[in-house]
Design a protein with these regions (language model features):
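A structural motif corresponding to the C-terminal lobe/cap of the Radical SAM core domain
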Residues: 72, 84-202
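Conserved SAM/AdoMet-binding glycine-rich loop
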Residues: 1-133
Length: 202
């Protein structure tokens, strides 16, 4: 049967559930991916982006591993390498949990020996409210550990309507945001070049 309301009542961790609003049967994201791969052979390459690390279960990794037309590309934003900053962002995971997910993803999906390496991408925000130099250095360490092929790095800017804008003072000076942003960009540029050379070597 058709997949209905895949965005509601969906769990990345396990079996089917029901939409509490419509009473319809829904599927997991892993099930949806597998179904599209199997039932729509005309799609030559399947790729999805911007995954929330807290909800990314092994079932999704296994579907990607076992489905040759699903790209082994994961864009999983970290936003910061500091647990204090992540808590202020209300991200719902720690640096340690995030890195553990990257390790699991690599264990499942990085198979250069069969020409199927895993490519990782991330997002980082520099100068989030309350970010200290220690927090900034922790984010540098995260970049070194994560070894993204590419990472989208931006200076924080307050956005009306967001919790950060309403509740957190934008207390990192613009010059400091700019310096930290440039340092992270330079570091990621080096890492991207190194990862690119590793891919060529594989």
């Amino acid at each position: 049967g058709a997949v209905t309301q895949p965005q509601k009542g969906c769990s990345a961790k396990g079996g089917h559930s029901r939409d509490p609003f419509a009473g319809e049967r829904v599927t997991t994201f892993a099930g949806l991916l597998s179904m599209i791969h199997e039932r729509v052979p005309g799609i030559q390459r399947l790729r999805f982006v911007t995954s929330y690390p807290r909800d990314f279960g092994d079932d999704v990794l296994e579907v990607i591993r076992d489905s040759p037309r699903i790209c082994r590309y994961l864009h999983v934003p970290a936003q910061s390498g500091s647990n204090a900053v992540l808590a202020r962002m209300n991200r719902g995971y720690s640096v340690e949990e995030y890195l553990e997910f990257l390790d699991r993803a690599r264990a499942h999906l990085h198979q250069p020996e069969i020409n199927r390496p895993l490519t990782l991408a991330g997002d980082i925000i520099a100068g989030f409210p309350g970010e200290t130099e220690d927090d900034h250095e922790a984010t540098k360490r995260l970049l070194e550990r994560a070894r993204y092929k590419n990472c989208f790095i931006f200076k924080y800017s307050a956005r009306p309507g967001t919790v950060a804008h309403e509740k957190l003072p934008d207390d990192v000076p613009e010059s400091v945001k700019r310096r930290r942003n440039n340092e992270l960009l330079a570091l990621q540029q080096r890492i991207s070049a190194e990862v690119g050379r590793e891919f060529v070597g594989e």
